[in-house]
Design a protein with these regions (language model features):
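Active-site nucleotide-donor binding segment shared across nucleotidyl transfer reactions
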Residues: 5-47
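Glycine-centered flexibility motif
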Residues: 23-24, 85, 145
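Generic alpha-helical propensity signal that fires on short helical segments
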Residues: 37-39, 80-82, 156, 165
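Conserved catalytic core of two-metal-ion nucleotidyltransferases
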Residues: 44-121, 125, 129-132
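Conserved nucleotidyltransferase catalytic core and NTase-mimicking acidic/glycine-rich helix/loop elements
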Residues: 104-287
Length: 287
């Protein structure tokens, strides 16, 4: 496998650390979009405070991400080791199949526990301002957990398509996916709603180093009329961002979050779906 020569030249000039190509360009290059960046893992550089950054080279983009040398991040399982000044070489397996299965299952269960925690915040007895937000966060977390439990590494821009192609062997998994999709409201994806959500998202993420890259991906999905995928992706980005914020910070930006996530205020429907998500989380954690 080759990546553009200018990339290799840039890496030769800029970095002496061990590097690897990760992300969809390494894991699933056949599904990568033109807007997808080349994710470069840098091992052992500023381990206590890795400085991620974006570099534009021509029409393509590199994103550098710092990892500890002994990282067990699932992102690295199908990495392609960089040999400076040469082609890319597929790295020898660093993990046994048993270790990989165990890691995926553990990561999946962890995300489902997170989903259960979020949906459990919703009261069944009274309407609360942040109930629709908790529900969407739970739905995204549960879907991510399902992919991980199925040994599929979630790739946010491709995630809805990953779910479409997932070989579901258990009815409880299929039911959980359908419930989550209903919670997210993907069928509401119209250009009007997406344009409004996109503007709110850019305001929410304006301080992030990668906001231009994320925006270019959304524009790609819009331009290619992948409206459902775009709706899912915007929501995923917002929920990922909110997971790193405390509750007071979330409430300070509640209006923007509501617009970006296309939240509705149907209390009865939120209560019904919260009960179903809670049931699905518990069922999957038992299996």
């Amino acid at each position: 496998m080759k990546i553009p020569d200018e990339f290799l030249h840039h890496l030769t000039e800029s970095h002496n650390s061990e590097m690897a190509l990760v992300g969809c360009r390494a894991d699933a290059p056949d599904v990568s979009y033109d807007c997808c960046e080349y994710d470069i893992a840098i091992f052992g550089e500023n381990e206590s405070n890795p400085q991620n950054k974006i570099v534009k080279l021509g029409n393509d983009t590199l994103e550098f991400q710092g990892f500890p040398k002994q990282s067990n991040d699932i992102l690295l399982y199908k990495m392609i080791r960089m040999i400076t000044g040469d082609d890319l070489l597929i790295s020898p397996p660093r993990y046994s199949e048993t270790d990989i299965k165990r890691s995926f299952k553990a990561a999946g269960k962890s995300r489902i526990v997170d989903a259960l925690f979020n949906v459990s915040k919703n009261s069944i007895n009274k309407a609360e301002l942040n109930s629709p937000l908790n529900l969407k966060k739970a739905a995204y977390g549960l879907l991510e957990g399902i992919l991980l439990m199925s040994e599929v590494r979630p790739m946010p821009i491709h995630e809805l398509n990953q779910l479409r192609q997932l070989e579901v062997k258990k009815d409880i998994i299929n039911e959980a996916i359908q419930t989550c999709i209903e919670c997210l409201g993907v069928e509401r994806a119209t250009r009007t709603i997406l344009n409004r959500s996109f503007r709110a998202l850019k305001e929410i993420l304006k301080e992030r180093y990668d906001v231009e890259l994320l925006s270019s991906k959304i524009e790609f999905l819009l331009n290619h009329k992948l409206l459902a995928d775009c709706y899912y992706y915007i929501g995923r980005l917002v929920c990922n961002h909110l997971e790193q914020k405390n509750n007071s910070s979330q409430m300070n930006y509640y209006k923007l979050n509501s617009i970006a996530l296309d939240l509705t205020s149907d209390y009865e429907n939120t209560k019904k779906l919260s009960t179903l998500i809670k049931r699905d989380c518990k069922n999957l954690l038992k299996n």
